[in-house]
């Protein structure tokens, strides 16, 4: 299950559908792809691609069908099924800048590699009118998902990481962000044949972190953790654990099924037992918080 992720500014690292089974892609954002949005699969693939956002960026070839591609189903993994595709439920996805495909995802957004005269017949065999069974998830409409993902994705706790801030800003503005001296930091091994121009950083595709200003330097004051179990002394003392006993990190103080260190990491009060098997209790436990304790 791929849910509420951001896939941004790459040429070959977006989702590739595996063979023989389900593939669920819900409420994600794919931005600034070059030759791949989603592709792959085989005759046994069962795809749910629901309420996502596909936003072309500076590197996306707007003069090609790739620019409004949601998914490219593939076949031919086995000789006896070389022309047999899997099944797909594709619905509710927004392709930014393309009203036609947004209105009907099957009007150009699903692109099996067949000739035009076989396209209608092939799509009819692939298309499903109802989604396949998949893990429980609250599905947002695509517009709401776009805003939700951009405000929640990445390293946001206790504040947004500088790298993720740059990526999110690029998605919002639709523009590549790079350093003034980016041209000085080209790095591609001589053994690698380039597929893009040397200045592809101007379109969001970098080959060296220094092309976008380098990696940020993080500073902070470590909290006291006497037993080194990953849980601060103050948190352990607050909830009746032993700051001198590292073994209590993997214990379960309230029997809810999560280790104590998992409770700490997820901001859960270990004195309150919650039935996490009840789906209505499942939520983002860090939502709205600025610190763990």
Annotate the PLM regions.
Residues 1-14, 21-35, 46-58, 89-97:
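Right-handed parallel beta-helix
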Residues 7-8, 234-241:
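Glycine-rich, acidic and aromatic/proline-enriched surface loops and short helix-turn segments
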Residues 11-19, 34-40, 58-66, 99-104, ...:
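Short glycine/acidic-rich loop motifs that flank beta-strands on beta-rich extracellular proteins
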Residues 42, 47-61, 66, 74, ...:
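A conserved active-site cap/scaffold subdomain adjacent to cofactor or substrate pockets
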Residues 90-91, 95-226, 232, 239, ...:
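C-terminal functional modules
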Residues 221-229, 248-256:
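Acidic, divalent-cation-chelating loop motifs in proteins
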Residues 239-250:
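Extracellular-facing binding/remodeling surfaces
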